[in-house]
Amino acid sequence: MGCFSKIAMLRQAALALALIGAGAAAGQAAQVAPHRAAYELTLDRATSASDVIDVSGTMDFEWADSCTGWTVKQKSAMTVGYSTGESAELGWNLLSWEAKDGLKYRFLVRDLQNGAMSDQFKGEAALDGPGRGGKAVYSVPDKKIVKLPPGTLFPTAHSLKLLENAEASHPLLWEMVFDGSDAKGLFGVNAVISPRLPQLSGGKLSSPLLATPSWRINLAYFAPEGQAAAPENEQHIDIHDNGVVDLLIIDYGTFRVRAKLTKIEPLRGPAC
């Protein structure tokens, strides 16, 4: 697995939290749950065809109300061990802001390898209106414009639609999503939403944020160009109706990475 692919693996794990965990509050004021969470990253399983034998790391996530929009902060670090005896130290940081009407988005993404920054993406994006297209303007690493097709959603708007579908027992959703996480930042996301999960008790974490209905959402990520038969990767997320994710599994075919919630705390909203 090349350097870029390794970092992209961690980026996709963190992206799932930004894509899901930021959106529940956007249209459901009674369930607003700005929060700070910590996750432990481990190797869930690997097939005999995989050269990955160990994964360990952490992922810190914060979602907050900024009055005019929603902010997401993430900091991730992961060590990947290979059957050759080599290992890679990977990191991924994200800071984003999305307007509450879902039409504007700003992002700053940094990829790290062995403690040094290997990539950086910065810019802003805007849609011409609900359901309409728009453009993303990158300022780092190079100045360029990415056209966004009609129907494109930003992460919070997408996650809101996911939870609306879950509440309404609508199991399928396909959308184009822009998040700025790489040089193109645009991808197709196919979602399959399970029926409501049974509410379990006696877990290691005790928080009112976890005492709410939840669903498992299976996400498949596709490149935006062409008609790819297979997704680049798949993810399985257990999410509560307040937007809190307590389990994330990233499936790369020959191995899976698990992100398990280890700490959760609510954040106070601002005095807008």
Segments predicted by a language model, with ranges:
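Hydrophobic/aromatic-rich structural module bridging two neighboring secondary-structure elements via a short loop
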Residues: 74-127
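N-terminal cleavable signal peptides for secretion/export
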Residues: 27-84
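A short, structured loop/turn motif at beta-sheet edges
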Residues: 28-34, 62-71, 97-103, 207-211, ...
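Bacterial N-terminal signal peptides that target proteins for export
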Residues: 2-14
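Bacterial N-terminal signal peptides
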Residues: 12-22
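Beta-strand elements of well-folded, non-transmembrane domains
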Residues: 41-45, 61-67, 78-82, 96-100, ...
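Mature, soluble, non-transmembrane domains
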Residues: 108-272
